[in-house]
């Protein structure tokens, strides 16, 4: 079963531009790879400018599907609708998820910094 994630940036207008990542979206994999291999604004832009991401590899490389493009969301809550995690680059990667009660929670990524 896939652990779905949205990955992106916060735009100047307050919206979030996010690309879907299908496999292994949990912080111990995608979060770790983003922090260790894609920890810059330029890298975040590169990720969201392509098609949907199939999977990330431990070395930082990734595979893409042939289709799909970035979506725009008005809030982290919207970006999490239907997804397990949302990763946003704002000076560094931040990770969000919904608790079992529906509250938005930030997941600590400092383990991999």
Regions inferred by a protein language model and the residue ranges of each:
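Low-complexity intrinsically disordered segments
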Residues: 35-113
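Short, solvent-exposed aromatic-acidic interface loops
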Residues: 18-29
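Short, solvent-exposed loop/turn motifs
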Residues: 15-16, 104
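Short acidic-glycine loop/turn motifs at beta-strand connectors
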Residues: 10-14, 89-92
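Short beta-strand scaffold segments in enzyme catalytic cores
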Residues: 4-9
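Cysteine protease-like catalytic core of ubiquitin/ubiquitin-like
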Residues: 29-35
